[in-house]
Design a protein with these regions (language model features):
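Disordered, acidic Ser/Thr/Pro-rich linker "stalks" and the adjacent N-terminal cap
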Residues: 296-315
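Flavin (FAD/FMN)-binding glycine-rich loop and adjacent Rossmann-like elements that form
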Residues: 1-301
Length: 315
């Protein structure tokens, strides 16, 4: 699922109140209303805003708002057409996500089915007057977590981020967990709905091979792909973070220079030399966990005396 990472402020002097978006329909958020009602019954009190959206505080009385929970800022199931869509269709999808997100916050701020305390908390936030001045204070970028990707001779898959984690041609390391947001919302025969596709699986640091960003020789010999690289959905869910993009971009730049200077195709460069240059520049290719700290005197005493018993006469 895609969403907008919202920058909001709780500074009254800098805050723009949430407004009703075009074609607003409160029943679009019916499941959110039912979720809030269920949370109230379960906890015996009104839910807080952080229960339906992730709030990461940043300086200047602002916060980064992201998806959190089964009904939040992710517009589940509405991103499917985007990767292969025309530019016109992509604009439609973009605006649909915009109006959904505006409606999400307006619903929380205005709808009578939302507990009063949650409405008040939502209304304490708003778009900042001093951000995104050229787009009516709305974020410039839709969070496109995953879109079109190259399919090369080597496709990085789940095993490459979980079990087969060393490679002969490493250009960096990844360590972010496999993080897939929900893919679709399914209506079940019993009348309930179920979100499908969310995945949060920890991984150990793994090596990223040069091969992920070189195309098939039959398709191109002068192209390097450091973002839309050759990876499955599960592998990409871990690789799709900015630190990995920066590592791959650095390696792509060096590889391009080596290809030009040696007059070779990107598939034929000296990868050993590429890896060596990356190491010289400080790129980490191996992970060695830090040794545990030495035990304290208190911990040593507990360990030594754990199985020792004393008679009453001892005291």
């Amino acid at each position: 699922a895609y969403n907008f990472r919202m920058i909001l402020t709780n500074d009254p002097a800098n805050r723009i109140a949430f407004s009703k978006p075009p074609d607003y329909d409160p029943y679009r958020y019916e499941l959110l209303a039912r979720l809030l009602e269920a949370k109230m019954k379960q906890a015996g009190k009104a839910p807080q805003l952080r229960e339906v959206t992730l709030i990461a505080l940043i300086p200047n009385h602002k916060a980064d708002f992201n998806n959190n929970g089964p009904f939040s800022t992710d517009y589940i199931g509405k991103s499917w057409d985007y990767p292969n869509a025309s530019y016109a269709r992509r604009r439609e999808i973009w605006m649909d996500h915009t109006n959904y997100t505006k409606g999400f916050f307006y619903f929380l701020a205005d709808d009578p089915r939302v507990p009063e305390s949650l409405r008040e908390e939502t209304n304490s936030w708003g778009l900042p007057k001093d951000e995104f001045l050229d787009t009516d204070h709305w974020p410039h970028q839709l969070y496109i977590r995953e879109a079109r990707r190259m399919v090369s001779d080597f496709v990085m898959t789940q095993k490459d981020v979980q079990t087969d984690i060393t490679k002969p041609d490493p250009i960096g390391m990844g360590s972010y967990n496999s993080d897939s947001h929900n893919v679709q919302r399914i209506l079940k025969p019993d009348g309930t709905v179920e979100n499908e596709g969310d995945m949060q699986v920890p991984v150990k640091p793994y090596q990223i091979p040069y091969r992920v960003m070189i195309p098939k020789r039959t398709e191109a010999t002068n192209l390097l792909v450091p973002v839309c690289f050759s990876a499955s959905h599960v592998a990409y869910s871990s690789l799709r973070m900015e630190p990995q993009y920066m590592m791959l971009g650095q390696a792509a730049g060096l590889a391009a220079a080596l290809a030009v200077r040696s007059q070779k195709n990107v598939q034929d460069i000296d990868v050993t030399r590429l890896v060596g240059r990356l190491k010289e520049q400080g790129v980490i290719m191996e992970y060695h966990p830090a040794p545990p700290p030495p035990p304290s005197v208190r911990e040593l005493f507990k360990k030594i005396t754990a199985n020792v018993s004393y008679s009453p006469e001892f005291f």
